[in-house]
Amino acid sequence: MKFKIFSVIAGLALLFSACDEVLDRPSPTVAEDESYWVSAEKVRLYSNSFYLHYFEGYGTGWTHSSAPLLDYTFNDDVVNYSTQAQFTRAVPTSTGWGGNYKWIRRANIMVDRIDSRMKDILSVEEYSHWMGIARLYRGLEFARLVNTYGDVPYYDHVVKTSDLEDLYKDRTPRNEVMDNVYDDFEYALANIRLNDGAQNINRYVAAALVSRWALYEGSWQKYYYNNPSQATKFFNLAVAAGDIVMNSGRFDITLDFRSLFGSKDLSSSKDVILYRKYDAAQGVTHCVASYSNVSESRSVGPNLSLIKSFVCVDGKDWQTSSVENSKDFSLANLIKTRDSRFEASFYHKPTVKSKSCYLYPVKFIPRSALKYLEVKGGAPDVEYTSVNNLNGYPVLRYAEVLLNWIEAKAELSTLGAGSVTQADIDLSVNKIRNRPLAQEAVERGVQKTAPMELAALPDDPSRDSDVPALLWEIRRERRMEFAFEHSRIIDLRRWKKLEYMDTDANADLLSGTWVNFPAECPDDLVDGNKGKIRVMTASGDLITFDGKNGAKMVGFFYPAENKGRLPFLNVPNINPYLTPVGSNTITDYSNKGYKLTQTEGWPESSN
């Protein structure tokens, strides 16, 4: 499935809303609204205005706010060639949730207008479908809000500017909000069409999204709020949503990993539930592949923690694997001994173009685009430079649904609400591990990873004692599958595992790939790099290049510029799991005689 750019209606929803610093308030009079809701096609046009909000893909041109590689760089997978990005350390002045409420207002307008003005215009089937779409949008936006702020003011109706009690009400408890989201999601799954055309949201798209957000909420309830009954409710919803997609027979794992992200046309791929297509003729291009072309210098790249997380081809972690040379971290060996997603995600040679780690991500560019590197003096094709990129992005993948589904089932088994069978593992993790390999990968020695066996799970010595082995390995699968995509920081928060980002506790967060400089990068051992190249040996010793010790420059690349982040755990007045509301927003409420409670764990102001 694909969707296009609906430039004609890009500003459509603005006809029905206006903004201020607290919530989006409606315009006092909007003539367009009175005459708009007259047909199903008008509803479709209004619905289409949500697409780029929820399905940005690679972004457009230089513009991107939630694009892979470029925007998901705050987690334990990446290292910056500088001080690492910090967690919020004080209540900000002006940031808040106004942008979310803009979309909630738009969704509530859609719900209201369909119900109050279109019952005699739409058929019963049309009414149910479009109401399902509207409630899906509302549920998604509140799920996003709650994931960020915890308790939030809940609205299931269009707020009137004259109703100050409503406009300035305090937060609604998270469980009450999410119970309403649960109802919206259930309605959407029961009423959205199974098929509404190749460019439109259908029930399978809705189910994929519900599987994601229900899993997230179940985890929050289990690990952060210690509420097993609420956790069970949402884990069950995640499983049910996954079942809808999996039982349809429409989806499968058929493409090699790299082709998922480098192909221009994914319309016939069973791996993809929804994707964004790019078209130069329409002026719709992106820049993400340009930052994957091994010519563009990158200051953010994969760290050693991510590298070590990749499972060996026998299905075991690197410390317990029986694969020959499993403890050899040279890139050539990692490609042969690790899961195929490693080779598909990274350039096969260490390079200074990835300044923080010498390992360059190439996950989001087709293999053919890097053929220029085989030619002396070659340069990337114009299509893979600047904002000329045309490869499409799979905004919803079948693999994600499978991993959401199996994780939810595994979580339910820990809550006494079901069990996981080998058949479940085969339908999910093992189906993904059995995806086809690109011929170029095979020629480099890449192999498929052995199936996961429930009766013989790895005993990873790095596993947290409070995480069962099955969940540990499922979480590993997510990390390999979704590197540089949307989910890692969300995963750490919902598992209550932000300690994984503590650079004081884990040097692997600040170091990169293994580099044998004399053999692999001899041209970098020049006087101009004195004091700039530093490696960490396998035993943890640091060696800095001094112009004479080039032969010793073998180890994990660890430049002195890679600095750790400040403490963020168990610090008074800091809650790294939830985001504070800006003090100006709280002051605005107070000035009007109302109270807005600050986010849990944060003071009312930055003073």
Residue ranges with predicted function:
Residues I5-L14:
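Sec-dependent N-terminal signal peptides
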Residues F16-A18:
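C-terminal motif of bacterial Sec signal peptides marking the signal peptidase cleavage site
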Residues D20-N80, V152, M178, E186-Y187, ...:
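An aromatic- and glycine-enriched ligand-binding surface/loop that stacks and positions planar moieties
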Residues E41-E56, D77-Y149, E165-A198, S330-K336, ...:
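Conserved, well-structured interaction surfaces
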Residues N100-W103, N180, G262-C312, R433, ...:
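Long, intrinsically disordered, low-complexity segments
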Residues V146-N147, P153, D196, Y216-Y225, ...:
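Short coil/turn linking the two alpha-helices of tandem helical-hairpin repeats
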Residues D328-Y398, G601-N607:
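Flexible, polar/acidic helix-loop-strand segments at domain edges
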